[in-house]
């Protein structure tokens, strides 16, 4: 970048809106797993959509590439600048712009932390249902850019389903205002959907209008032992049928995952008296706690008679509920502390999850005998975090060196089931070079056409998702 371009960018954001200090920039150049490490000499921190727009206009004019970043919680390298690009942090775009209680909608800037948005909705007696382990750090812009899923997809859908409107800064600096709060709008192409899940490669999301829902008056949570993933799938069908659609979360947990959490997370304990090979964490929401508890207990008793359920425990307080959820939410952290691990974020039809787990696990163990399967996640929507920890006492570096080989084998099996190699984390750089193996030529051509049309100079997050 030449001196003139640097000066123009600094002038746009002012002295508080940029940093060239390596120690300040460094935390933004490495993601949580430490798998990807980047490089950038300049971090811009605009505090308005107009500043973002002006930054993009200058970068487009001078062919200066940049990488947008939210809370830096992404897991596939999509938010990391690898070639010295300008780092565009959206953390200062952190205002809740408006909450319309009657319309059940909320307008927020892209840098608002997910937990902050949830809290703002709760204060108005409403619910923003997107919920995931990184919600204390992840931002709305990042959630939108990756089309995040989380634990409530079963009832409320993925992030894409929770968006009414968007504001997007385009590569040439124009600001696209799609901030409609309408639930029905059939006036041409739904342009906002192009940018959701695009990982900042087509435009920079600066604000959004989000759907809100009535806050449930009651919630019941159960930790349930099941003999197999197949039993879990059948239990899900039974619970959905008997609950009338009140099941909001249904999470699969393997015994080894529970053991890792108890080993590495202070205060974690087994909720049940006897071990089981698998568990599910079930949550239902509705109007009356007593009715929810009674209905869930009756459904679990019926499932037990069918051999689908072993032991189970229902949370009797908010503290107990939080303790049960912490077992699921700390799974990734516990696996990280355990050592080297190879991870996959995949989805298959719910009915295919048991066979997928069996076949894919066998394929990995054939390649790496002794590898420890830690498969968990959102079985209610078919999204499994298909992870493996390195063999006990094995060489972690040697295990990680086989990531691409193992990933390819797993993704081939996913594809055979008509599944997706990225359920909710995105493509980034991790899966970019495999995407063409599982997408048709027509799909890839259309994706490249969109990229060339909206970003002809390839300044927006270059090298991510799709190459042009």
Short names for language-model regions:
Residues 1-57, 74-104, 257-269, 318-342, ...:
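N-terminal flexible segment immediately upstream of the FAD-binding catalytic core
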Residues 21-29, 224-225, 233-402, 406-409, ...:
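C-terminal substrate-recognition/cap domain of FAD-linked oxidoreductases
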Residues 70-73, 93, 133, 255, ...:
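Short, ordered loop/turn segments at secondary-structure junctions
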Residues 95-251, 460:
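FAD-binding subdomain of flavoenzyme oxidoreductases
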Residues 174, 432-468:
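Activity-critical C-terminal alpha-helical subdomain
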